[in-house]
Amino acid sequence: MARLRGAGAAGRCRPGRFGSSARRHGLADDGEPDRVLPARRRCSARRRHLVFGVQHPARRAADLRVRQRGDQGGHLRATVRRSRSRQRCAHRTHRLRRWRAPGTLSLTDLYAAASGDFFDFESTWRAVQPEDIVTLIYTSGTTGNPKGVEMTHANLLFEGYAIDEVLGIRFGDRVTSFLPSAHIADRMTGLYLQEMFGTQVTAVADARTIAAALPDVRPTVWGAVPRVWEKLKAGIEFTVARETDEMKRQALAWAMSVAGKRANALLAGESMSDQLVAEWAKADELVLSKLRERLGFGELRWALSGAAPIPKETLAFFAGIGIPIAEIWGMSELSCVATASHPRDGRLGTVGKLLPGLQGKIAEDGEYLVRGPLVMKGYRKEPAKTAEAIDSDGWLHTGDVFDIDSDGYLRVVDRKKELIINAAGKNMSPANIENTILAACPMVGVMMAIGDGRTYNTALLVFDADSLGPYAAQRGLDASPAALAADPEVIARIAAGVAEGNAKLSRVEQIKRFRILPTLWEPGGDEITLTMKLKRRRIAAKYSAEIEELYASELRPQVYEPAAVPSTQPA
């Protein structure tokens, strides 16, 4: 810590350098645990910092640097380190290392310049004011260039205590840090809540290994994006199906059938019968509790899902095995989480209630507006965009369309700018369509529904990378996306899954045609963000030719229709 204090001073972050001339530090996040200490020192020493992911090309990092320049000579100093543990990111990090604009320091440079006597830490932290900007979080850029969200100490403190009031956080609670630190969700759970409540954080450098890490961590509170929950679900189902011990296999099959009954009752909005309650208690004692231990969730008190919609079927599945998950909603502009309910109080299909201390209302066009202590200070150096987002009465226009029930539970319809309005003027939620189809197609990892201004809906489907290897190995097939996208059995299975999903949608929402892309979409790439949000405009532009073929008068090669009568297990 002392070394970092001196390092910060070497970066000219001395007391008195606040306001527009305050020094701003940038941290290039490679997912390694030692990124936390520099960020923590900047939180307590009245320095602003931002974190950007190593997936950003050098020109994006340079653009952020230019946009961060202060009017009175402030500078962004980027600290960049190269990851040796994640070879997939190594070349991208190397590109950032070659980008050494004037005034840029590496952590090595910063440590070398450190002086223990140069910095008065005590007086500096005492000078921190609630409305001082502590960090900048850049939006994902799904609808345009990323914007720097200015968050204050007051924002983050209110967020932490509001989460505690609703969910309950204890000293020593075990959590994981595995999502990108450029995202506020991981920063809140892995850094800010740890500082406020003394949680125990285990950093997992590669998010793809999170399932393997959970049994060692044994988290007591845990949250993830929907795709992680869906992968855990697929892993459980795979384990049950591949159990070689006959007695264990039968016990697992019985317990999972009981869990399925509980899930079905939840989906139907029905109470469990006394018989089912007793049967589930027995299944839990003999099998399900041991399954949770095996997953690492034996001591889990509550679990969350956020950042994107999650299928109700996934939530019901986990509730069935004794892991109730609360779906939450928030955004960087609201300092992370803005709605939540404890899993014991949650309602399936909703994102809970507005956190205590916030005000909310639904505008005439359905957009949800929020006012209160979690609203950001503004977008960095973009007063016009700030004025568009926060009106003169202090209401933040979230861009999300909501419904609310009589008890105050909120349901996200979709992003206001992403609603599908077909040729007949019918409004539809693409997220609802996508979640419904994805729940019936476990081999598909990502899909984008298309239909704005069209007479019917179509979809682009992309494989789940983790499903390809096992599926191909079991059948002796080439595991490449291109080969599987052309395999007749795979096409038939996915067509059956689309038909199954369509059966749960209204006629106008149903997918009439689809194509399976012979590629994978990587988080942080052209098509999806690190938290698996679709970059719809970029996808529409990149795959414009493929999309037009979906609407051709005659069925084109590699364009398919849902199976009229599902004749095989959906993929």
Swiss-Prot record:
Disulfide bonds: none annotated. Residues 78-91 have a biased composition (Basic residues). It is an enzyme of class 6 (ligase). GO terms for cellular component: peptidoglycan-based cell wall; plasma membrane. Keywords: Cell membrane, Fatty acid metabolism, Ligase, Lipid metabolism, Membrane, Transmembrane, Transmembrane helix. Pfam families: AMP-binding, AMP-binding_C_3. Gene3D superfamilies: N-terminal domain of ligase-like. PROSITE patterns: AMP_BINDING (PS00455). It comes from the Bacteria. The chain crosses the membrane at residues 314-334, 431-451. Residues 1-35, 67-91 are annotated as: Disordered. InterPro entries: AMP-binding_CS, AMP-dep_synth/lig_dom, ANL_N_sf. The keyword Lipid metabolism applies. Belongs to the ATP-dependent AMP-binding enzyme family. PANTHER family: AMP-DEPENDENT SYNTHETASE_LIGASE DOMAIN-CONTAINING PROTEIN, LONG-CHAIN-FATTY-ACID--COA LIGASE. This is Putative fatty-acid--CoA ligase fadD11. It comes from Mycobacterium tuberculosis (strain ATCC 25618 / H37Rv). The gene is fadD11.
